[in-house]
């Protein structure tokens, strides 16, 4: 499964580890993803999403029904 947030689209980015001596080695910065279950009252079922912490805040703000409508409009199966 790809490390991508289903709501925000956040994905891993690349950068450098920088030591005290300023040596640089390549690394990946991974998004803070969590698999989370949401109860959707209108559908009377649970929906499992892989979302970042930012995505969780978006759901708190807009509501799960509005977010699911946006996902379905984008063509994602939920």
Swiss-Prot record:
The keyword Ribonucleoprotein applies. The gene is rpmB. GO terms for biological process: translation. This is Large ribosomal subunit protein bL28. SUPFAM superfamilies: L28p-like. It comes from Thioalkalivibrio sulfidiphilus (strain HL-EbGR7). Keywords: Ribonucleoprotein, Ribosomal protein. Belongs to the bacterial ribosomal protein bL28 family. It comes from the Bacteria. One of its GO terms (cellular component) is cytosolic large ribosomal subunit. HAMAP family: Ribosomal_bL28.
